[in-house]
Regions:
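N-terminal export signals
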Residues: 1-23
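C-terminal helical cap(s) of enzyme catalytic domains, especially alpha/beta-barrels
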Residues: 286-303
Length: 303
């Protein structure tokens, strides 16, 4: 259902009250600078061209998805970040192996939940952590998958153990480990964070994913996830209309995310990180939508 409810002031006054346990303590980039915009990009094999596009949009931070994690890419990426003045806020990790983004195959293919790909993905996240360390990227971020709602499910316990292994590895590299929201309900995500029990865990709060997967209204989810939020994906979407497929992503301001109240809530939480625009289409329309989102979000952040 759409984002409705009590007035913004009374709703946000309760943010963060209901979460027990400690929020992440390991320092990252967040907290040093004012609320600012970012863009998630796929770097590909040409870091200079990819980061040049971010700079041409007059955006100063980026979450980076890398196809290549070889050491030979460290130098070119660092040079491109410095040349274009882009602050990297997270390295986004997916795979290896097939990932299917729907309700039937998703639980079998996404993240650290599936047994068949778990070992390879643990190793891949560790490689990504090493790569991020050499590039000066403060966080590693991934979808952990359809974490079971039932904490007595053996898959839940196995997934927690796997997350603990990669989060501990990131901690040794001086990084935060971030869960990308989407496949799990907010209370399941908080349970997993607390059961993993390491202080460098955080959440990349993807506003649309909570809606696309039918898991929560993001405004309500902030009450649980607020203390853990280290990154934001500014994205919009519609609720699912059939039980097989995710809801539809739409341009920011055209979906069910209540951005004015979300930004107000982030300010109340004293969130000091990046609000990272994500638009999962390609071509000229993607650039148009990113520019429109930037204008819209700048107006909200500045008020």
């Amino acid at each position: 259902m759409p984002a409705t409810g009590a007035a913004a002031g009374s709703h946000h006054a309760s943010l963060g009250r209901h979460v027990s346990g400690r929020a992440p303590t390991l320092s990252a980039n967040e907290g040093r600078r004012p609320l600012r915009l970012g863009l998630i990009i796929s770097v590909g094999r040409d870091p200079d061209a990819a980061l040049g596009k971010v700079r041409n949009l007059d955006i100063g931070t980026a979450q980076l998805f890398m196809d290549e994690l070889e050491s030979s890419f460290v130098g070119p990426l660092r040079l491109a970040l410095e040349k274009h003045g882009i602050e990297p806020t997270a390295l986004v990790v997916g795979g290896p192996g097939k990932e299917v983004w729907n309700f039937y195959q998703g639980p079998l293919t996404i993240g650290l939940v599936p047994r068949t790909t778990r070992s390879a993905r643990i190793a891949h996240i560790k490689r990504a952590s090493d790569f991020a360390k050499h590039c000066g990227i403060p966080a590693v971020q991934t979808h952990c998958g359809f974490i079971p709602e039932n904490p007595n499910n053996p898959l839940y316990k196995e997934t927690v153990q796997a997350i603990r292994e990669v989060a501990a590895y990131c901690r040794r590299n001086g990084q935060n480990f971030r869960y990308e929201t989407g496949q799990e309900t907010p209370i399941t995500l908080v349970r997993a964070i607390q059961d993993v029990g390491i202080d460098n865990q955080g959440v990349n709060f993807d506003l649309a994913n909570l809606i696309l997967y039918g898991k929560a209204n993001p405004l309500d989810a902030m009450e649980l996830l607020g203390p853990y939020i280290q990154g934001i994906h500014a994205k919009d979407g519609l609720w699912p209309t059939n039980p097989r497929d995710l809801g539809q992503e739409v341009p920011i301001g055209k979906g069910k995310v209540d951005f004015p109240r979300i930004i107000a809530g982030l300010k109340e939480l004293n969130y000091r990180g990046a609000v990272t625009i994500e638009r999962e289409i390609s071509g000229p329309q993607q650039i148009e939508d990113i520019r429109a989102a930037k204008t819209y979000l700048e107006r909200l952040i500045g008020t």
